Curated annotation (Swiss-Prot):
Its EC number is 2.8.1.13. Pfam families: tRNA_Me_trans, tRNA_Me_trans_C, tRNA_Me_trans_M. It is found in: Cytoplasm. Disulfide bonds join 98-195. Residues 145-147, 307-308 are annotated as: Interaction with tRNA. ATP binds at residues 7-14, 33, 123. It catalyses: S-sulfanyl-L-cysteinyl-[protein] + uridine(34) in tRNA + AH2 + ATP = 2-thiouridine(34) in tRNA + L-cysteinyl-[protein] + A + AMP + diphosphate + H(+). This is tRNA-specific 2-thiouridylase MnmA. InterPro entries: MnmA-like, MnmA-like_C, MnmA-like_central, MnmA-like_central_sf, Rossmann-like_a/b/a_fold. It comes from Blochmanniella floridana. One of its GO terms (molecular function) is tRNA binding. The gene is mnmA. Catalyzes the 2-thiolation of uridine at the wobble position (U34) of tRNA(Lys), tRNA(Glu) and tRNA(Gln), leading to the formation of s(2)U34, the first step of tRNA-mnm(5)s(2)U34 synthesis. Sulfur is provided by IscS, via a sulfur-relay system. Binds ATP and its substrate tRNAs. Belongs to the MnmA/TRMU family. Its main location: cytoplasm.
């Protein structure tokens, strides 16, 4: 009997994943990871409640639950990288980092080496398919819940040891199963936002770790419109929190961030979500991962997702070097944010991805500083 360690988060997806693997004949055990040390603002931290729910789930399913603390690894490999990216003017994706560095690295190693597992499993909405002795990562059946965007860094050795039992189910079906099993998580809300921030105000949380300096907000013509509260608090395409809503150049459209200059501490804005300064067809991607391990040597046509739950866009990929790609979209897209992930697909198959480092607006944004 093959042994599977299921990452039990205290949510409905992982609890149903564990039950499904039991039905498939695996020897199932649970593991709860603590990735963030509780601070003095306990009302914002759900880890104690999640652990309690994890115990309840495992008791109901009659499986053992292991606990492990990866807070140090998370701090060094996820949170510090997250902070450095924000300080550099990027908008990072900590979920991608967490999957790469914690769930499918430290958790996988711990399960295989310390707990003697054959596989690990999680409640991600993705599927795997074995094609010509290579494992392909595929989108989950539920298009609204597909999480392949967050798993593009996985390699063949990792995928060979991973099971994703709910990838062929819809969220509705998962909740229905949980209710039939009387699991405590059946009606539990999905977690949203950045896990270590929880319900806290993003700006106040980040200011505890990053030195913040207010600066000018200017429009694309160089006119000063107001003051920003610190460049790291803003991302390309952001509308809220600018506090310049009453200022207009005549078209009455809301203001959006179209560029950030870290060196001069200046935020540049323009009006309208489809402003040419916010729209792009071309961008550069680095830190490349190919799921099948093949290095791209010639241009290909595929589709790309530039943020979670956004529709894929047809594109051409041109390799500039082993770790740098030029992406040309079939049609312009608004608010491409450097620091976010660009994930590539051929139909339902996730083939890889990387980190957006630069975008090229439809019209050049002139320097006035």
């Amino acid at each position: 009997m093959k042994k599977v360690i299921v990452g039990i988060s205290g949510g409905v997806d992982s609890s149903v994943a564990a039950w499904l693997l039991q039905q498939q004949g695996y020897l199932v055990e649970g593991l709860f990871m603590k990735n963030w040390e509780n601070d003095d603002e306990k009302e914002y931290c759900s880890s104690e409640e999640d652990l309690s729910d994890a115990w309840s789930i495992c008791n109901t399913l009659k499986i053992p639950l292991h606990t492990v603390n990866f807070a140090q690894e998370y701090w060094e490999n996820v949170f510090q990288v997250f902070l450095q990216a924000y300080q550099s003017g990027f908008t990072p994706n900590p979920d991608v980092l967490c999957n790469k560095e914690i769930k499918f690295k430290h958790f996988l190693d711990f399960a295989l080496e310390d707990l003697g597992a054959d596989f690990i499993a999680t409640g991600h909405y993705v599927r795997c398919m074995n094609v010509k002795k290579k494992i392909t990562l595929m989108k989950g059946i539920d298009q609204n819940k597909d999480q392949s965007y967050f798993l593009y860094t996985l390699n063949q050795q990792q995928l060979k040891r991973c099971l994703f039992p709910i990838g062929s189910l819809t969220k509705l079906t998962v909740r229905k199963i949980a209710k039939e099993l009387n699991l405590i998580t059946a009606n539990k809300k999905d977690s949203t936002g950045i896990c270590f921030i929880g319900k806290r105000n993003f700006r106040s949380f980040l200011s505890n770790y990053i030195a913040i300096q207010p600066g000018d907000i200017i429009n694309i013509h160089g006119n000063k419109l107001g003051l920003h509260q610190g460049i790291p608090f803003y991302t390309i395409g952001q509308r809220k929190g600018l506090n310049i809503g009453g200022i207009s150049n005549g078209n009455g459209k809301p203001w959006y961030v179209v560029d950030k200059n870290i060196t001069h501490n200046v935020l540049i804005v323009a009006q309208g979500i489809n402003h040419p300064c916010l729209m792009s067809r071309i961008f550069i991607v680095q830190k490349i991962f190919w799921i099948k391990g093949n290095i791209l040597k010639s241009p290909i046509q595929c589709s790309v997702k530039i943020r979670y739950q956004q529709s894929d866009v047809q594109c051409q990929i041109y390799p500039i070097s082993v770790d740098t790609l030029k992406i040309i979209l079939k049609q312009p897209v608004t608010a491409i944010a450097p620091g976010q992930s660009a994930v590539f697909y051929i139909k339902k198959h996730c083939i890889g991805g990387g980190t957006i480092i630069k975008r090229f607006p439809l019209i050049h944004i002139k320097n006035y500083y």
